[in-house]
Amino acid sequence: MNYISLFSSSGIGCFGFKQNGFECIATNEILTKRLKIQAFNNKCKYDTGYLDGDISTKEIKNKLFTEIKKWQTEHKILEPDVIVATPPCQGMSVANHKKTQDEIIRNSLVLEAIHIISLIKPKVFVFENVAAFMNTKCGKDGEERKISEAIKEELEDIYDFQTQVINFKDYGAHSSRS
């Protein structure tokens, strides 16, 4: 089994996939120092799988599709098994009462992940974020809608999906984020 990680920070959001034998096709993070942590931990099979930059740019998307094609050729996969996306939560978190316009604009990065999922069509996709994630408004070209509506509009013809709020404290984490 394999996966792609978007907005992956230092790789914690998909650590369980790697720990359970999944192979990383590609991982994307905008901050180089965070991606270096993933490389230090040998997250991806190939060095070219570490995609350093903004996922909304054509350059990074092209690198992502190049990695997928490499795996289709060398590993005979049809499509990735999983895409896990952990978009920035600063503009979504109820703990952040002083949201700036930049943080709110970051909410719309999730639209990039939704669109990439619709193009790649992995067997499964996972969004990990704060409890308010699905009700947070995002927008593109002046049109605002809830993230849940954006997911439904772009992915409901391809996937059956469900949402669930999980508190990782119930699974061994030492703090609660709810």
Language-model segments: residues:
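Generic structural signal for short, solvent-exposed loop/turn connectors between secondary structure elements
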Residues: 1, 21-22, 43, 100-102, ...
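SAM cofactor-binding core of SAM-dependent methyltransferases
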Residues: 3-58
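N-terminal Rossmann-like NAD(P) cofactor-binding module of classical short-chain dehydrogenase/reductase
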Residues: 4, 82-84, 126
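Short, glycine/acidic-enriched capping/hinge loops at junctions between secondary-structure elements
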Residues: 37-39, 62, 96
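Short, structured active-site "lid" loops
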Residues: 41-82
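Class I S-adenosyl-L-methionine
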Residues: 64-80, 90-178
